[in-house]
C-alpha cells in the first residue's frame, strides 16, 4: 500500500480534491436552486432530483468543457510552437525525446507501437484525441444542461418560450457561458508559459532548475 501511494500520490490527491470540490459545488448549487424555487413560490426539490436539473448539469459540464479544450489545444500547440525561456516549451535547438520515431523493439513499448500501421498512428495522437473527445462530450452535455436550465427559468417566469437544443446553441446565453470559461483557461496556460520563464519552484517538474538562466528553454 505504501508503494502504491508513493507511485500514485499525485493522481490520488487530485482525485480527492476534485471529488470534494465537485461535491461542494453540487451541494451549494442545490441550496441555491431551492432558494430560487422558493422565490417563485415553488416547493424545494431533493438532492437526487437536483442532479437531473439543468442547473446542475450545465454548471458542471460548462467548466469541464473548457478544461478539456484547453488541454487538447495545449498538447497540439506545443508540438510545433515554442517559447524561449519557458519550461513549458520544447528546446529551440536541441532534439527532444518526444520527437523521435517510436521503436517497437524498445523494452516495455506499448502494444500499439509493436503493432504499427494505423494503430500506431492513432496511438501517436491518442492524447489530443482523448482530450477533444472529452471536450465534445462535455460541450454537448453543457448544451443539454443549459437548455434545460434556460427552459426551466422561462417556465418559472411564466414565459411560454421553449427552445430546442439547436435554437439554444444559437443564443448569446450559451456562448457567453462557454467563452467566459474558455478565455480564463487560456489565460491560465499563458500564465504558466510566461511566468516559468522568470520564476521557479524548486522540486516541480513544471519549473526549470532554480539556477537555470531565464533564456534556457525547456525543463
Which residues fall in each region the model found?
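Perimembrane loop-to-helix junctions flanking transmembrane segments
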Residues: 36-55, 156-166
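Alpha-helical transmembrane segments of multi-pass membrane proteins
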Residues: 18-33, 138-143
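Extramembrane terminal tails and long inter-domain/linker segments of multi-pass membrane proteins
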Residues: 2, 45, 86-118, 203-219
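Transmembrane-helix bundle segments that line or gate the permeation/cavity pathway
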Residues: 23-32, 77-91
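Domain-level detector of nuclease and nuclease-like folds
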Residues: 102-133, 137-140, 144-153
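N-terminal first transmembrane alpha-helix
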Residues: 6-24, 35-41, 45-47, 58-66
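Alpha-helical transmembrane segments and their helix-start/interface "positive-inside/aromatic belt" motifs
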Residues: 1-19, 117-133
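A structural feature that tracks compact, well-ordered secondary-structure segments
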Residues: 49-82, 87, 132-151, 163-201, ...
Amino acid at each position: 500500500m505504501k508503494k502504491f501511494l508513493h507511485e500514485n500520490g499525485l493522481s490520488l490527491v487530485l482525485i480527492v480534491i476534485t471529488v470534494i470540490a465537485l461535491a461542494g459545488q453540487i451541494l451549494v448549487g442545490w441550496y441555491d436552486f431551492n432558494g430560487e424555487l422558493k422565490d417563485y413560490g415553488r416547493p424545494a426539490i431533493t438532492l437526487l432530483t437536483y442532479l437531473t436539473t439543468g442547473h446542475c448539469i450545465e454548471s458542471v459540464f460548462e467548466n469541464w468543457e473548457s478544461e478539456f479544450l484547453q488541454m487538447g489545444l495545449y498538447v497540439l500547440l506545443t508540438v510545433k510552437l515554442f517559447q524561449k525561456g519557458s519550461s513549458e516549451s520544447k528546446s529551440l535547438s536541441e532534439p527532444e525525446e518526444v520527437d523521435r520515431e517510436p521503436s517497437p523493439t524498445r523494452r516495455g513499448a506499448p502494444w500499439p507501437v509493436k503493432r504499427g500501421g494505423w494503430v500506431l498512428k492513432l496511438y501517436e495522437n491518442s492524447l489530443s484525441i482523448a482530450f477533444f473527445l472529452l471536450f465534445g462530450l462535455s460541450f454537448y452535455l453543457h448544451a443539454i444542461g443549459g437548455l434545460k436550465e434556460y427552459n426551466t427559468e422561462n417556465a418559472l417566469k411564466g414565459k411560454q418560450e421553449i427552445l430546442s437544443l439547436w435554437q439554444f446553441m444559437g443564443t448569446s446565453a450559451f456562448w457567453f457561458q462557454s467563452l467566459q470559461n474558455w478565455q480564463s483557461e487560456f489565460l491560465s496556460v499563458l500564465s504558466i508559459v510566461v511566468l516559468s520563464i522568470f520564476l521557479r519552484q524548486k522540486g516541480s517538474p513544471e519549473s526549470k532548475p532554480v539556477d537555470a538562466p531565464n533564456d534556457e528553454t525547456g525543463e
